[in-house]
Amino acid sequence: SRGLGDVYKRQILCTLFFGKIANKFAFALDLYYLCSRKCGRIWLLATTEKNAKTALRGFSKPVRLYQITFVFVGIAVFLPSIMYHYYSGEKPMNYLFTSESVSEGHPDKVADQISDALLDEFLAYDPNSKVACETLVTTGQVVLAGEVKSNAYVDLMEVARRVIHRIGYNKSSYKFDADSCGIFSAIHEQSADINRGVERAEAMSQGAGDQGMMFGYACNETDNYMPLSLDLSHLLLTELAVIRREASAMTYLRKGKVTSYLRPDSKSQVTIEYNERNEPVRVHTIVLSTQHDEFVTPADDSKEAQEAADREMLQTIYNDVKQVLLPRVIAQLPERVRTLFDDQLILLVNPTGKFVIGGPHGDTGLTGRKIIVDTYGGKGGHGGGAFSGKDPSKVDPVSYTHLTLPTILRV
């Protein structure tokens, strides 16, 4: 611990650079430090620069009352701050980290999937196709835009409708369905200036259509080397989609038929608590928002009856998420992750209270707006480029296939 010699040196330095008043406050700090470190005998060094040496020998000169008062005033002023910084340094605090995911029916993901399906269709018939396809989806409308150079003919509208139907938007009540939505295409030929940079006689000398920054990241929190918060967010929505298609749980009786009340649009968010060694210690919070049918009919047209029906729907969904979805997800996890779920878990389901209006009717969707969901959930870095609807001459998607994936597999 700090000795009295160090105290004396600090007093002299404070006097030289900051004056006598600063000297007395600095001494008050040193006095507290000596006491807190339990260095044995507690010395009351109420001194000025004139009698510092004699005070160290045991107060051979009389101590003035104002000097003692000044010392204790200094202690009272600085003690709380010193205690906070001193002890917080020895006791690091846990911290929280959150990642989110979105379902296949989220508007932005609908747009991503249409763009990817168009790309796949072009490459299937002409592997040398150059494609940059963007999609916008909104109420009853799909807009396709971008640049393509290919020898293949693709029925753009048929591909888009097929994707929308597979996702589950196949009812007119959704205000966006595969059979009736309008589809407008503004896709045109790729720029010749870009094409001259990507066309090569040899496949191994493929040029890049643009510059870009890409980041790879891997961790040992999960078996697939992805951050735990993101992995759990994905798994929640993947299992929710399975339940929706099975229609054996999270259902209601509609016109004498058991029907799933789940609709395609949903989001999840998982918060993990970490200790000072960056190790996950527990699942802190799960937020899950899922679009649903209006499966409880109000008793009458009054506002009170509608609110009562909304509360009943919310309670049903909450119970099903807690008793059906979570157990199915946890059962798929390794033992070391299962132990992170405890009774203190905060579960929030449809926090706004109702989620009937959703999908592209509720929010406009665009290709490339979920780049953090598509990568590492906020951990690691991101260069800003999206993946969907781009052929291999675009550096954003191809880098994760040829560079990042082999790196992860070697970990």
Question: Can you name each region flagged by the protein language model?
Answer:
Residues 98, 169, 174-356:
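Glycine-rich, mobile lid/loop segments that gate access to catalytic sites or pores
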